[in-house]
Amino acid sequence: MSLILAIYGKGGIGKSTTSANLSAAMALKGAKVLQIGCDPKHDSTFPLTGHLQPTVIDVLDSVNFHLEDVSKEDVIRTGFAGVDTLESGGPPAGSGCGGYVVGETVKLLKEFGLYDKYDVIVFDVLGDVVCGGFSAPLNYADYGLIIACNDFDSIFAANRLCLAISQKSQRHKVKLAGIIANRVDYEYGGGTNLLDQFAEKVGTKVIGRVPYHDLIRRSRLAGKTLFEMEGPGKEECTRPFEEMAEYLLAQPQATVPQPYHDRAIFEAIGGWR
């Protein structure tokens, strides 16, 4: 059976860059990994492959949405460290339902029988959980992961995601494996002081601290993982992903989170320092 991870976080928080480097780190430790981008922008796997690949919705459209006419080779590409990649895609901006496409992608994966082929499957899911379609990966995941920064908007979104995971856990096996702190800045951004307090309050922990570093920005522009980059700070940037990969591959200590009510999170964060 595959270890299935669903990664969420506020829009623009760095989910795709983080997911790609985490997938690469697990692959470098010997795991066979599939990363699935669940965003109409279809750029989740760009750091792994160096290009934008055909999406599931593009391929389905070309065969008039007959699933039986689609093969694995039509939608899956292999990127850095042997990580297989797939992009669900979505409808044109301003039309259709992206959640429907996520559901169709999951259906296609089940048709292919891919859950038995991989050691790890990573769902990189867009923004906040805004509808049932985008929460679909939680129906299949062993663990949810939340990416967040040390600021109010990010923590507010993380709390909403904790609520989604808590609700899904009532009918499915999914639990929260932890929070990944991104763009950690100890000089000007408070490090992870707010995130640490939030994690403790909702019953989880910060499992990784990814620094705010220019090498990460440049890796995204280059369409590469951090492991392929050269320059100052490489070890500082790759170490958190190596540590998180070890943690996740070794059956993490997961919990069902206990999120705040929306009004309560406003009041709580205002008193944190």
Swiss-Prot record:
Cofactors required: [4Fe-4S] cluster
Lineage: Bacteria, Bacillati, Chloroflexota, Chloroflexia, Chloroflexales
Gene Ontology MF, one: oxidoreductase activity, acting on the CH-CH group of donors, iron-sulfur protein as acceptor
Gene name in the database record: bchL
CDD domains per the UniProt record, alphabetical: Bchl-like
UniProt name for this protein: Light-independent protochlorophyllide reductase iron-sulfur ATP-binding protein
HAMAP family assigned to the protein according to its UniProt record, in alphabetical order: ChlL_BchL
Keywords noted in UniProt: 4Fe-4S, ATP-binding, Bacteriochlorophyll biosynthesis, Chlorophyll biosynthesis, Iron, Iron-sulfur, Magnesium, Metal-binding, Nucleotide-binding, Oxidoreductase, Photosynthesis
Pathway participation: Porphyrin-containing compound metabolism; bacteriochlorophyll biosynthesis (light-independent)
Top enzyme category: oxidoreductase
Source domain of life: Bacteria
Self-association and partners: Homodimer. Protochlorophyllide reductase is composed of three subunits; BchL, BchN and BchB.
Cofactor binding notes: Binds 1 [4Fe-4S] cluster per dimer.
Amino-acid positions noted as binding ATP in the UniProt annotation, renumbered to this chain: G12, I13, G14, K15, S16, T17, K41, N182, R183
Residues annotated for [4Fe-4S] cluster binding in this entry: C97, C131
PANTHER family named in the record: LIGHT-INDEPENDENT PROTOCHLOROPHYLLIDE REDUCTASE IRON-SULFUR ATP-BINDING PROTEIN (PTHR42864:SF2)
Family label: Belongs to the NifH/BchL/ChlL family.
Binding site for Mg(2+): S16
Pfam family, one: Fer4_NifH
EC number in record: 1.3.7.7
Annotated InterPro entries: NifH/chlL_CS, NifH/frxC, P-loop_NTPase, Protochlorophyllide_ATP-bd
Disulfide bonds: none
GO terms, biological process: light-independent bacteriochlorophyll biosynthetic process; photosynthesis, dark reaction
